[in-house]
Design a protein with these regions (language model features):
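Catalytic His-Asp segment of secreted/periplasmic serine-dependent ester chemistry enzymes
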Residues: 166-242
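Short hydrophobic segments within beta-strands
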Residues: 70-71, 162
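Generic structural signal for well-ordered alpha-helices
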Residues: 107, 143-148, 181
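N-terminal secretory targeting modules
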Residues: 1-67, 83, 241-242
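Short amphipathic alpha-helices and their capping/turn segments at secondary-structure boundaries
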Residues: 55-66, 104-113, 149-151
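Conserved beta-strand elements of the Class I
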Residues: 68-70, 91
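Oxyanion-hole/transition-state-stabilizing segment in secreted/luminal serine hydrolases
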Residues: 75-91, 102-140, 164-168
C-alpha cells in the first residue's frame, strides 16, 4: 500500500512539474486600456424635473389615473393633452430631452407606485450621432429594459408604446427610427404591449412628410399635429376604461 501511495505521489509530482513549465495556450500580447467615465452629470441633467415630480406625487397622494403618460418633449410639450383626452384622468410624467437611459435611472419617481388603468410610452432621444447617442439596436434594447420594468410592476395594465415620429429636424435619423419602430412592432406580442403607429398620419397622399403639423423648429408637433395623434391614441385608452 505504501509503495502504491509513493508511486501516485511521484506521478502527481511529475504532472505538476510539467504544468509549471508548460507553454500557455492563450497569451495576452497587449494590454487593453480601460477608461472609466462618470455619466452622473449627464444622467441627472434633468433633476429639477424629477424633484418636481417627487413633490407633486406627495401632494397628489392619490396616484390613480385612467392613463399614465411617460416620455420626452413630445409628451411634455403637449399643452392640450388633458383637454384632448377628457374625460379621461391623466397623470403625465415626462420631461424635455428625456432618454430611456435617464428614464430607467429615474424610474422610481416617474413610473413606480402609480395606479394607472393604462400606460402610454413615447421617447425618441436615445438615437443620434451626438456624443450620448446610440444606434438603433441599442435603442431597442433600452426600450426592452424599460418595458420589462413596467410589465413587472404593472403585469395586467395595458401598455401602449408609440412609434418614434419622423421630422425634418431629425431627417438623418429616419433609417434608425424605422428600424426601431419595426423592432418595437415585432416585439409587441412577446413583451405584452400594444404598438401604436402614429407615423402613418404624418405623411400626405404623395408620401411626403407634412410640414403643417410641426412647430417652427421642425421637430415638435403643433396643435394640428397633436389632433392627429389624439385621434389615433385616444380610442385605445377609451376602450380600456370601458
Amino acid at each position: 500500500m505504501k509503495r502504491i501511495l509513493l508511486s501516485l505521489f511521484a506521478i502527481a509530482s511529475v504532472a505538476f512539474a510539467k504544468a509549471q513549465t508548460a507553454t500557455p495556450t492563450t497569451v495576452i500580447k497587449t494590454v487593453i486600456p480601460f477608461e472609466q467615465t462618470d455619466e452622473t452629470p449627464w444622467i441627472t441633467r434633468y433633476q429639477k424635473d424629477i424633484t418636481y415630480y417627487q413633490k407633486e406625487n406627495k401632494r397628489l397622494k392619490d396616484l390613480s389615473c385612467d392613463a399614465l403618460f411617460l416620455g420626452s418633449s413630445s409628451i411634455n410639450l403637449w399643452d392640450t393633452i388633458y383637454e384632448d383626452f377628457a374625460p379621461l384622468k391623466l397623470i403625465r410624467r415626462s420631461y424635455g430631452g428625456a432618454t430611456l437611459r435617464d428614464m430607467i435611472y429615474n424610474y422610481n419617481t416617474i413610473a413606480q407606485g402609480y395606479k394607472p388603468k393604462s400606460i402610454v410610452l413615447y421617447v425618441e432621444n436615445d438615437l443620434g450621432s451626438h456624443k450620448e447617442g446610440v444606434n438603433a439596436v441599442k435603442c431597442f434594447d433600452l426600450f426592452r429594459i424599460f418595458i420589462a420594468k413596467l410589465k413587472k410592476d404593472y403585469p395586467t395594465t395595458p401598455l401602449f408604446v408609440v412609434s418614434l415620429k419622423p421630422s425634418q429636424h431629425k431627417a438623418d435619423q429616419l433609417k434608425d427610427q424605422l428600424l426601431v419602430n419595426a423592432l418595437l412592432e415585432e416585439n409587441a406580442t412577446a413583451q405584452g404591449y400594444t404598438y401604436i403607429d402614429i407615423t402613418k398620419v404624418m405623411y400626405d397622399e404623395a408620401g411626403n412628410l407634412r410640414t403643417d403639423i410641426f412647430k417652427e423648429d421642425n421637430l415638435h408637433m403643433n396643435g394640428e399635429g397633436y389632433k392627429l395623434w389624439t385621434a389615433i391614441i385616444k380610442p385605445y385608452l377609451t376602450a380600456v376604461k370601458k
